[in-house]
């Protein structure tokens, strides 16, 4: 469901705090979420690629090097649908473009690396990865987002 439709539908039925997530990596994205009616923006993948994140360096680098086309959406690994970096799926010995049907009975890493596990070896990431170009301290990411938010707000006021 498009976030434009979703936030409006939620607002019709719910007067509480609405938190929007998905593909947000900048202050402009946060402003857009607020303009759609969300109270807060929930940002995930951007903060994996920070100096303080408890993720291995290869995971952070893969995020920086990826685009939205490098994301596979599947429930194969955990039983719950999720977005994963295709490169990490390949590294586990699987073809991300030809994954077997999602079924816990068919989950078998024995044909590839026997110890591959979701989140440790198969890395989650959202479709906004293509807009992440660096690994910075969290403080710098937040400061940049604040500047971007203010600049986007200024641009809207100027138009």
Predicted feature residues:
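Conserved active-site-proximal phosphate/metal-binding subdomains
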Residues: 2-19, 24-159
């Amino acid at each position: 469901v498009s976030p434009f439709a979703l936030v409006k539908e939620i607002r019709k039925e719910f007067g509480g705090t609405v938190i929007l997530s998905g593909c947000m990596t900048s202050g402009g994205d946060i402003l857009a979420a607020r303009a759609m009616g969300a109270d807060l923006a929930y940002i995930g993948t951007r903060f994996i690629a920070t100096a303080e994140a408890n993720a291995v360096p290869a995971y952070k680098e893969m995020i920086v090097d990826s685009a939205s086309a490098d994301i596979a959406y599947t429930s194969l690994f955990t039983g719950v649908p999720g977005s994963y970096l295709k490169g990490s799926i390949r590294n586990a010995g699987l073809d991300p473009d030809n994954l077997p049907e999602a079924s816990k009975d068919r989950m078998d890493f024995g044909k590839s690396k026997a110890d591959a596990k979701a989140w440790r070896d198969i890395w989650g990431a959202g479709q906004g990865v293509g807009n992440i170009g660096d690994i910075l301290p969290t403080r710098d990411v937040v400061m940049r987002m604040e500047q971007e938010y203010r600049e986007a707000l200024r641009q809207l006021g100027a138009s």
